[in-house]
Regions:
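Cytoplasmic helix-loop-helix junction between adjacent transmembrane helices
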Residues: 160-196
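Intracellular juxtamembrane helix-capping segments at the cytosolic ends
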Residues: 170-182, 372-385
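Juxtamembrane intracellular "pre-TM" segments in multi-pass secondary transporters
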Residues: 55-61, 241-273
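Helix-loop-helix hairpin linking two adjacent transmembrane segments in secondary transporters
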Residues: 156, 193-240
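Conserved MFS/SLC helix-loop-helix module at the cytosolic interface between two early adjacent transmembrane helices
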Residues: 116-154
Length: 447
């Protein structure tokens, strides 16, 4: 700091920015110099709000509720892109003049896209800037939503659905963030908060798209989805800090490490497999619900199908509560409970298939059962490999959505062959396989 930083004007010092120091130089009294130097230093050392991109979260040090809430909300809006189409399948089928099987493929392809995004995009969170990955994915998802809204052929919808599914994996970047940076005692709880936002988005997407489809048609829903993605991009820039990467190396080496994790961690394989079959069981009921309710005695429109999504709020509530008790009761017990609940749900769905009360009960039970399995097993995977949380979550969620895609695909074939009873059989089989894996694991551990 030099005396040239200050210029007396009308008997009072005028403080000039330091970058003018080299341009002006003149003499001043020592007293004036000391006083002005003190004032200038007070300006330079004043506490400033640290920019979001300079904030660094520390592992196990805690994460603010504001960031958690933002991640939960954005997770809900982003994952909704994968589920807007479910109540609209009948409208899309009629508008594009395709069969029910072709319309059902939209849901299947979206889930496949999500699985591809989980496998190829989520691991990048250990290698590159997570915030940048999130921004790019939301931008592409917004563009693909516009493509779907303007599509005139089913093949265009299929292609855009594949991409929008792959780019809607943002919540699966948020979940490892919550697991890695939360305090150890709050990890499962905070993962549950983000997961409850994700589930709320799934439920709300079905309700909103059902009503928008009933009143405005199916195309405006995807224009709305594009606008929501742009808003989420702005919120992400303002709220989410950047984070240090967890992996040093190239993308090829990163992907190779996935295979090493698969081979070296049998618990991750088990957790992912049983949760995947459970998710396939849950999606089986949703993938054919629009077709079932369009038949007598319901003859319901897309708005009624969307309203059923509200029944799944039990799953979101369960996710926000289960996290508190996973550490106490263990993953095995939650997996047993979830498998049994799913089988019970499908029995209700079959016996009371011509009743709204029966279908609502089945949806509630199957959602709660699924969340028992997902949250407990997903938390276990992330906590087993905290330094590779994105890759551990990649393996879990890729398997999870492969199971979901398989369940959706099998349910679609079953509907063509035997309508709702055949769909119920598919759901029971998937739930039974999940439960069997848990029982076999329990017997091996006791042996």
């Amino acid at each position: 700091m030099t005396l040239s930083d200050f210029q007396p004007v009308l008997g009072r010092p005028n403080i000039r920015p330091p970058h003018f120091a080299s341009k002006v130089s003149y003499n001043a009294s020592p007293q004036t110099s000391d006083e002005c130097t003190r004032i200038a230093l007070s300006f330079s050392t004043a506490k400033r709000k640290e920019p979001t991109d300079m904030i660094q979260l520390k592992e196990n040090a805690g994460i603010s509720m504001g960031i958690l809430t933002a991640m939960a909300v954005i997770a809900g809006f982003t994952v909704a892109n994968c589920y807007y189409n479910q109540p609209l399948l009948e409208l899309i089928r009629a508008d594009l003049h395709v069969s029910e099987a072709q319309a059902n493929l939209i849901t299947v392809i979206t889930q496949i896209g999500y699985a591809l995004g989980l496998f190829f995009i989520i691991p990048m969170g250990d290698l590159y800037s997570r915030r940048r990955i999130i921004m790019v994915n939301m931008l592409v998802a917004a563009l693909m939503a516009v493509v779907i809204a303007t599509a005139g052929h089913i093949a265009v919808v299929w292609g855009a659905s594949l991409i929008i599914g792959a780019c809607s994996v943002v919540p699966q970047i948020f979940i490892p963030i919550a697991g890695q940076f939360s305090e150890p005692a709050n990890k499962s709880r905070n993962i549950g908060i983000v997961l409850s936002g994700l589930l709320t988005g799934i439920l709300a997407s079905r309700v909103v798209s059902g009503y928008v489809g009933n009143w405005l048609g199916w195309r405006p829903m995807f224009f709305i989805a594009a606008v929501l993605m742009v808003v989420c991009m702005g919120v992400t820039l303002m709220v989410l800090p950047d984070m240090k990467r967890n992996f040093e190396g190239r993308y090829a080496a990163l992907m190779k490490s996935l295979w090493q994790i698969v081979c070296g961690h049998p618990r991750i394989r088990l957790n992912a497999a049983r949760a995947g079959f459970a998710f396939g069981s849950m999606l089986a009921i949703w993938s054919c619900m629009a077709f079932h309710l369009a038949q007598p005695p319901f003859c319901a429109g897309s708005d009624k199908v969307g309203m059923l999504g509200l029944c799944g709020v039990a799953g979101a509530i369960a996710a926000s509560r289960i996290g508190k008790y996973v550490h106490r009761f263990g993953v095995h017990r939650f997996s047993l409970c979830g498998g049994c609940l799913q089988i019970l749900a499908w029995m209700v769905a079959y016996v009371f298939r011509d009743s709204y009360v029966g279908l609502i009960s089945a949806v509630v039970i199957v959602d709660v059962g699924t969340q028992c399995l997902q949250l407990s097993n997903q938390s276990a995977c992330i906590q087993e490999l905290p330094q590779a949380s994105n890759r551990a979550n990649t393996l879990f969620m890729t398997t999870y959505f492969i199971g979901g895609s398989l369940g959706t695909f099998c349910a679609g074939i079953a509907w063509e062959r035997g309508a709702w009873p055949a769909v119920c059989l598919v759901g029971v089989v998937f739930a039974a396989v999940s439960l069997a894996l848990t029982l076999i694991d329990g017997w091996r551990r006791r042996a």
